[in-house]
Amino acid sequence: MSRPRILFVHGSVVNGDLTWAAQRPLAERFELVIPNRRGFPPGPDVDRVDYEDEADWLEQFVAPGTHLVGHSYGGVISLFAGVRYADQLRSLTVVEPPAFRIAAGDPVVDDYIATSERIWTERSDDPSEFLRSFLHGVGSSTPPGELSPALIQGARTLAVERYPWTAEPPLDELAATPFPKLVVSGAHNPAFDAVCDVLERRLGATRAVLPGAGHSVPRLGAPFNDLLAAFIEQNA
């Protein structure tokens, strides 16, 4: 009997191998598909990253019965992919997708959008400085010392992303799809909480909160893995 198949979609700055390193133990129970998106090591730089185009790019990795899991920018991508590949997906999990427009009007969210726009429009030409500003803003840890070449490339790719807070994922269409949804947040930032609350309500999704790793919820390892495994096995 074939194992349930999970397609993991990473977010900004680091590639799939690093984002989902703590999920490798799940390979004992599931088939794991962990692509590195364009613009991330070991691939070359890119001129532009667009979440809708990335959803199209995922087609090559989607197969019947796929459980789709997206973190951060990968979560935004996955909200679009969930509609595009609805006939092939078994479930959808998103972890803190920065789709802030869906929660616009909430003062905390509006302030976060304004702060994010400043980080991009006033960004330093030095990728290291830009990356540190970004990581501080989203609630991720900032690496000490000189950044590795991989992180420098991640910062360059980050700078050419289509702003995720402009995304308008087709939530009504996504809500109408037959597969279950899981929305996870890290209990560190009320703006991300607000987005996840909207997704829970609009999609009829299961909601989970896993504190302890800030925005980088998958780095928790076992708590996230246990949650994801139980959700997928329930819907296999």
Language model segments and positions:
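Conserved serine/cysteine hydrolase catalytic core
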Residues: 146-213
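Catalytic histidine-centered segment of alpha/beta-hydrolase-like enzymes
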Residues: 210-225
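Active-site loop/oxyanion-hole signature of alpha/beta-hydrolase fold enzymes
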Residues: 31-67
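Gly/Ala-rich beta-loop-alpha elbow adjacent to hydrolase catalytic centers
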Residues: 70-74, 78
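Conserved HGGG/HGGXW glycine-rich cap/lid loop of the alpha/beta-hydrolase fold
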Residues: 1-44
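Flexible "cap/lid" loop of the alpha/beta hydrolase fold
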Residues: 83-121
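Conserved alpha/beta-hydrolase catalytic His-Asp/Glu region
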Residues: 124-159
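Short beta-strand immediately N-terminal to the catalytic nucleophile in serine-hydrolase-like folds
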Residues: 68-70, 95
